[in-house]
Amino acid sequence: MSRKYFGTDGIRGRVGEFPITPDFVLKLGWAVGMAFRRQGNCRVLIGKDTRSSGYMFESAFEAGLSASGADTLLLGPMPTPGIAYLTRTFHAEAGVVISASHNPHDDNGIKFFSGQGTKLPDDVELMIEELLDAPMTVVESARLGKVSRINDAAGRYIEFCKSSVPTSTDFNGLKVVLDCANGATYKIAPSVFRELGAEVTVLAASPNGLNINDKCGSTHLDGLQAAVVEHHADLGIAFDGDGDRVMMVDHTGAVVDGDELLFLIARDLQESGRLQGGVVGTLMSNLGLELALQELHIPFVRAKVGDRYVMAELLARNWMLGGENSGHIVCCQNTTTGDAIIAALQVLMALKHRGQTLAEARQGIRKCPQVLINVRFKGESDPLEHPSVKEASVRVTEQMGGRGRVLLRKSGTEPLVRVMVEGDEEASVRAHAEQLAKIVSEVCA
């Protein structure tokens, strides 16, 4: 059954435009409360990133929960994986994240965790959608939900992050630059790395409600690259606005993406005898990752794009490590969702075990040239179903003669078609990608 409101990761859009409006979010809070109250008493955690609109939507969602009779625990600004962790430790029925991740401040969204800190099952999302289309009722006054604030939420999550590495860990002598994207990690990440002994320089840690992801964070690495070189740092770490994506920069200023970080963690786990099963990537994972893992005899499978699908594949196979090239990395031995801070700590441990710099360690993987072009579209029609697009995709695949991949897919969070071509020669890969993107653009027009 198709979803009316939920995308691949909750509900997201432009602030003030349906469904990201206060009245809809209030009804959404009520629907969530009603769905979980069917199982008995209900407590729901709410956390958010640093967008100014987050306060408005927090109040609206909280009001809806109260109307349903569900209690609310407010965390304040908190990385998405921190909300997943605290939902588990507080034994709440659900966790709510008010965030649009790596998007600009004028977008926002709502995503959810189950009481186990995992994405909501499909049947629960469908139940919430049914309730959204039902008349809203309010419980009697004596049964209205109560609201309380968790004042030590940040400290709890900091200690959890530190517990993901051995207690003897000491990063003394390591110079690190952190880019916090003016987002949810702005206080927590510097504390974690400093308390573990690293010398930390911090960028983009002064949120004002409007500057989240603004020319900073994991999707805008120029500032971090320059700062790493300027400060003679060993490496740089960039988070996105809600702290579930991580990208890194080596001491030369070269970018190290999610595929490379995933490889470094997998190799370290294998070398220390801690790797369980194989690695889950996605349709967008670079072919070079697959080949590098193959050389180490580490199994590799591809899930659909989106960390919920990576997590589902990990659970189905009872494996422990997966991720996306965008920097969503799931380490199941520590977390139930992508956690940027914990993933970064695992990479630092891998470097420490090998006695290598990030620049040296990344030589174990040779990425294949990959070109990704985003094409914006309007309307309800699916450009990928157009005969011209299908024919062009088949033609380009045949022209590559089995030495590359073509992937066309719609974004689950934005009105975009992603055109990805991968092969062994960059000029031809770019030419093929531009050719396909041109055809998709013409169809979308």
UniProtKB/Swiss-Prot annotation:
Keywords: Isomerase, Magnesium, Metal-binding, Phosphoprotein. Mg(2+) binds at residues 101, 240, 242, 244. GO terms for cellular component: cytosol. Activated by phosphorylation. InterPro entries: A-D-PHexomutase_a/b/a-I, A-D-PHexomutase_a/b/a-I/II/III, A-D-PHexomutase_a/b/a-II, A-D-PHexomutase_a/b/a-III, A-D-PHexomutase_C, A-D-PHexomutase_C_sf, A-D-PHexomutase_CS, Alpha-D-phosphohexomutase_SF. The keyword Metal-binding applies. Binds 1 Mg(2+) ion per subunit. It is an enzyme of class 5 (isomerase). Its cofactor is Mg(2+). The active site is at 101 (phosphoserine intermediate). One of its GO terms (molecular function) is phosphomannomutase activity. Its EC number is 5.4.2.10. It catalyses: alpha-D-glucosamine 1-phosphate = D-glucosamine 6-phosphate. It comes from the Bacteria. Belongs to the phosphohexose mutase family. PANTHER family: PHOSPHOGLUCOMUTASE (ALPHA-D-GLUCOSE-1,6-BISPHOSPHATE-DEPENDENT), PHOSPHOHEXOSE MUTASE. This is Phosphoglucosamine mutase. It comes from Pseudomonas aeruginosa (strain LESB58). The lineage of its organism: Bacteria, Pseudomonadati, Pseudomonadota, Gammaproteobacteria, Pseudomonadales.
